A protein has these predicted regions:
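Catalytic phosphate/metal-binding cores of nucleic-acid and nucleotide-processing enzymes, i.e., regions
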Residues: 1-114
Length: 114
């Protein structure tokens, strides 16, 4: 897949937010925007799932997106605190992540940045 045909991260985020809002049933979902007052490394999308569990979704471009060390650290902290954290590149991966979170799954691996 040529790099120019891979969707931008912004496109991935917008597709996921659209699906989350259309699907409904989630207590809360929002896109965390970077600003001078925002903390670096926070997940792109935060959701409260149907069980009331905190879910952090870090969106990346398919095949080429990589976590930073700080993003990996924060995703690990979310998982260690009882939340659910996932790196996603598509709506299909979000569907799987939300189902796993709602089933009570823990993150099965540590996130490694870089």
């Amino acid at each position: 897949m040529a790099a120019e045909s891979i969707p931008l991260e912004k496109t991935v985020v917008n597709q996921i937010l659209k699906w989350l809002k259309e699907t409904g049933g989630y207590a809360y979902c929002y896109k965390s925007h970077g600003s001078a007052y925002a903390r670096s490394g926070l997940p792109d999308i935060v959701v409260i799932d149907k069980r009331g569990r905190f879910v952090g979704l870090e969106c990346k471009r398919p095949k080429v997106g990589r976590l930073t060390i700080l993003q990996a650290k924060i995703l690990n902290q979310i998982a260690e605190s009882g939340g659910y954290a996932a790196v996603v590149t598509s709506v299909e991966e979000v569907i799987q992540a939300m189902a796993a979170s709602e089933a009570g799954a823990a993150v099965g691996r540590r996130f490694i940045g870089g």
